[in-house]
Design a protein with these regions (language model features):
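Short gly/ser-rich loop at a beta-strand->alpha-helix junction or flexible surface loop bordering the NTP-binding
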Residues: 1-178, 334-342
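Surface segments flanking catalytic/ligand-binding clefts of nucleic-acid enzymes
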Residues: 157-342
Length: 342
């Protein structure tokens, strides 16, 4: 192993790659612990890594600000080698790692990347709480970042890189490592199976609790299949983008379905038309409220407030009481972080 990408460099690579990095490959199984390189790979290699990995796309909202001339994050073992570098930021890891925590980037085994679960723990020590939730939701999503894809994303053919259960299992074995407390706390708020960053952001804005700036509508699942009858009485399966379960203090319950703008979430004109047909079937076939949310709507905080009012009015589930005097300020700040164009 010549180098090991970690922290934000690992996150950006994982989220920009269409293929999974296989921890169970025979090649990776041959590598013995300790896996982390002892020191940095050398100036020439560092320069090449910065040129190759330094321009990967990032997800809006994860970091409050993107540092100019971002360096590449590398994991090393020797604390005496962790001095300032022009092209890389060095992070020391002296503990013995399971082989599944470091994944080969290519078959030559020269470059490795930290696993999705390990990466989540690492960046939880660097991000604020909302950023950690967003990063975890991205790692548990069904998309990867792709400049050539519709809306800047494409769909993974092999499913998410990880899931909350796998992350929880990994964290349970990490003792008191740096980042473990916020990583565990944020895990309960992570949403899985999003098909775009904005789909996940919409779910979080609507359903995170008040203290985190959300509208606290209820629990949410993304892209969960539901069974219904169409207008002809035929049994069909449809997959709304968001399924939200609302509940008030008297335990009254209601379900709301939302679909996010197909022109930005999904790919191709035919796919968009299928999504529009799907929305019509959902409206006619399900005995619960259904809403379509456009990208234009999310550009206005007041429009989001209006959507929340409509959802509550359609279900009869009133908002829970709160004593927070700055609630709207918190909600506006979260909306701006997730959706305001910079």
């Amino acid at each position: 192993m010549d180098y090991c990408l970690s922290y934000f460099s690992a996150f950006n690579l994982l989220m920009s790659s269409s293929r999974p990095f296989d921890s169970s490959s025979s090649a990776n199984a041959m590598v013995k612990v300790p896996l982390v390189p002892e020191s940095a790979p050398g100036v020439a290699t560092e320069r090449d890594l910065a040129a190759y990995y330094g321009h990967l796309p990032e997800i809006q909202g994860v970091r409050l600000q993107k540092e100019p001339n971002s360096k590449i994050d590398l994991l090393i073992r020797d604390v005496n080698s962790a001095f300032a570098k022009e092209h890389v930021t060095l992070h020391v890891c002296q503990s013995m790692m399971l082989p599944s925590s470091l994944l080969p980037i290519d078959t030559d085994l020269k470059g490795f990347v930290t696993s999705p679960e390990f990466t989540y723990l690492q960046i939880a020590s660097k991000l604020d709480f909302i950023g950690t939730i967003l990063a975890g939701s991205a790692l548990c999503s069904d998309y990867f970042l792709n400049h050539d894809g519709h809306g800047g994303v494409s769909q993974r053919q092999n499913g998410p890189l990880t899931n909350r259960a796998a992350i929880a299992k990994f964290l349970s074995m990490q003792g008191r490592k740096r980042g473990i407390v916020p990583a565990k706390r944020a895990l309960q708020h992570i949403v899985e199976k999003a098909r775009s960053p904005r789909e996940a952001s919409l779910a979080l804005l609507l359903c995170l609790p008040y203290n985190l700036g959300g509208f606290n509508l209820g629990t949410v699942e993304l892209n969960r299949p539901i069974e219904l009858e169409n207008r002809y009485g035929e049994k069909i399966t449809r997959i709304p983008d968001l399924t939200i379960q609302l509940k008030d203090k008297r335990q009254k319950r209601a379900t709301v379905l939302l679909d996010y703008d197909p022109a930005t979430t999904h790919s191709g004109d035919q796919k968009i038309m299928r999504d529009l047909d799907r929305e019509n079937e959902l409206v006619t076939g399900v005995q619960c409220p259904h809403f379509s949310v456009s990208g234009e709507m999310l550009k206005s905080f007041e429009s989001v407030q209006g959507l929340v009012r409509q959802i509550r009015e359609s279900t009869g589930i009133t908002a829970r009481d709160t004593t927070m005097s700055d609630l709207e300020e918190r909600q506006r700040a979260l909306w701006a972080r997730l959706f305001k164009t910079r």
